[in-house]
Design a protein with these regions (language model features):
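Glycine-rich flavin
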Residues: 2-7, 12-41, 57-64, 69-204, ...
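Beta1/beta-strand and adjacent pyrophosphate-binding region of the FAD-binding site
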Residues: 37-51, 204-211
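Short hydrophobic core segments
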Residues: 44-46, 151, 166-176, 211, ...
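Flexible, glycine-rich terminal cap/loop adjacent to redox cofactors
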Residues: 46-72, 77, 84, 88-95, ...
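Conserved phosphate-binding and hydrolysis motifs of nucleotide-dependent enzymes
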Residues: 47-52, 176, 212-217, 302, ...
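Glycine-rich dinucleotide-binding loop and its adjacent helix/turn
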Residues: 83, 175-234, 258-261, 313-334
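A structured beta-alpha segment of the ubiquitous adenosine-cofactor-binding alpha/beta core
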Residues: 162-164, 268, 281-291, 303
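FAD-site-proximal beta/loop scaffold in flavoenzymes
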Residues: 188-204, 291-367, 454, 469
Length: 510
């Protein structure tokens, strides 16, 4: 079936709800007030982020009664403190960078002046523009009962909040994640930043030190250096360690060229503050210790799931530090009424994965299909300039599994007419192929996150590298690079000695 639940959270507003099946949201419960309201629902969803909203919207539009709990902001981390504000900030930073680089096109400019308050206004405007799609009013219009309270288990089939007790046929836990704070000496004593506080900084940071060289850390490093801050990134291992290594190095060198200091193989051991200066002590894997001083510290070393005060044990819901214990069906192994979606499932922590999980839930719970969370390859994008897009196995992972029985046909954007015209030729398309089967792809360059979708469609539908050669790509586009990388896989066959002999023989035919 189509991916209905994944789309519903951002679908146009549906018709009015059926009053016969839609309970009303109760008033908050307090001592001396009316007794706690008792309700029954086909589905209780805890968490109004991407996964929870998609699951709730889909179920409501299928005609089921839905209670949606959210104690914080509707839209969750992605809308309010994650994907949307970070990409809005990156867009502002990109505009500043383009002004500085306009000279290569023969356009003379003056250095851009950054107004931090107006940059933050741009970020807030992006959030506010999208917010109605995720709003309480919209979901009440779809037929959901939205309760803005903390929810917890009272029994395996019962969820309670200060005002309401709901007995549910099915329960979805979609509570997301928050920044992981490492146990570094002195860290708790200083006003460090996370993604939840970064975008509301009252003053622009003079020197932002970032703990963590993953996608979030590197994206914010580039954003703030382009806006005029001094940046130091401290990474215990390799920056962008989950990306194709060669592509990661291209991005790392680009950031260094823009002025970002990146310390790889350095572990932060102690943090202290003296006046307005934050001091981070580090220990390297090799070499001398380094003390980094800055005005602000951003912690971006990873994420941890959020189950605070949910009384999961009362719901017979087993979990570990990564998330609810589920299989590839996303159903709790200990309580069959419960499903975990998005970050709560302890798998890849992407908004698009959360939406996919909601689709898997809808297909399995409502239509009894056999779709699993692992049935499609997962694309991942780091939104630096150049972007890095990854799908399936990296080259290193493929060689570890299959040895030399793989090929890596590629196409460099320095050969792309569109990239040349745009004076932006950094990067390449690399396919990972084994016996004609696509095992993965990595793309680095402008719009890599859009280009990877061609390969994602192919891999998701069982198509091989051959099918990526068999379509007409408009000229001039960067997307041609995917087709030309696929063509490169067959270069020796098409233009080799055997082909030449065959063509020679065929030319003898009148």
């Amino acid at each position: 079936m189509p991916e209905t639940a994944d789309q519903n959270a951002r679908a146009p507003l549906a018709g009015s709800a059926d009053p016969a099946r839609t309970p009303t949201s109760p008033a908050p419960h307090s001592p001396g007030a009316a007794p706690m309201r008792e309700m029954k629902a086909d589905l209780v969803v805890i968490g109004a982020g991407s996964a929870g909203l998609s699951a709730a919207a889909g179920a409501a539009q299928f005609g089921l009664s839905v209670v949606l709990y959210e104690k914080g902001e509707m839209g969750g981390d992605c809308l309010n403190t994650g994907c949307v504000p970070s990409k809005a900030l990156l867009s502002a930073a990109k505009a500043a960078a383009q002004i500085r680089e306009a000279g290569k096109f023969g356009i003379e400019t003056t250095p851009p002046r950054v107004d931090w308050e107006k940059v933050k206004l741009h970020v807030r405007t992006a959030i506010a523009t999208i917010a109605p799609v995720d709003s309480q009013e919209r979901f009440e219009g779809l037929g959901c009962t939205v309760i803005r309270e903390h929810a917890k288990f009272a029994a395996p089939d019962t969820i309670i909040s200060p005002s309401t007790r709901v007995k549910a046929r099915r329960i979805v836990i979609a509570t997301g994640s928050r920044a992981f704070i490492p146990p570094i000496e002195g860290l708790a004593k200083i006003p460090y930043l996370t993604n939840e506080t970064l975008f509301d900084l009252p003053d622009f940071p003079e020197h932002l030190v970032i703990l963590g060289g993953g996608p979030i850390g590197m994206e914010m490093a580039q954003a703030f250096v382009r806006l005029g801050a001094k940046i130091t990134v401290i990474e215990m291992d390799k920056a962008l360690g989950r990306s194709d290594r060669a592509h990661a190095e291209i991005a790392i060198e680009t950031l260094r060229a823009e002025g970002v200091t990146i310390l790889e193989g350095y572990k932060a051991t102690k943090v202290e503050q003296e006046g307005q200066t934050i001091r981070i002590h580090t220990e390297p894997k090799d070499g001398a210790a380094w003390i980094v001083e800055g005005s602000h510290l951003l912690v971006a070393v990873g994420r941890q799931t959020v189950f605070d005060g949910m009384d999961l044990e009362k719901g017979d819901v087993d979990h570990d530090r990564k998330g609810i214990l589920v299989g590839d069906t996303l159903r709790s192994r200990s309580n069959r009424r419960v499903w975990a979606l998005g970050d709560a499932a302890g798998r890849e922590q992407f908004t698009h994965i959360a939406g996919w999980h909601a689709s898997v839930f809808a297909r399995r719970a409502f239509f009894k299909q056999r779709t699993t969370a692992d049935s499609l390859p997962v694309p991942a994008v780091t939104y630096t300039s150049p972007e890095i897009a990854q799908l399936g196995l990296t080259e290193a992972e493929a060689r570890k599994q299959h040895g030399d029985d793989i090929t890596t046909p590629s196409f460099r954007f320095e050969e792309s007419d569109r990239a040349i015209a745009e004076a932006d030729t950094e990067g390449e398309v690399k396919l990972i192929v084994r016996k004609g089967k696509l095992l993965g792809a990595s793309i680095i360059g402008k719009d890599a996150g859009d280009l990877i979708q061609l390969v994602s469609v192919a891999m998701s539908n069982g198509l091989g590298v051959k099918e990526l050669t068999n379509f007409i790509s408009p000229y001039p586009t960067r997307a041609e690079g995917v087709k030309r990388a696929a063509n490169a896989h067959y270069a020796d066959v098409v233009f080799g000695k055997s082909a030449k002999r065959l063509v020679g023989l065929l030319q003898r035919i009148p």
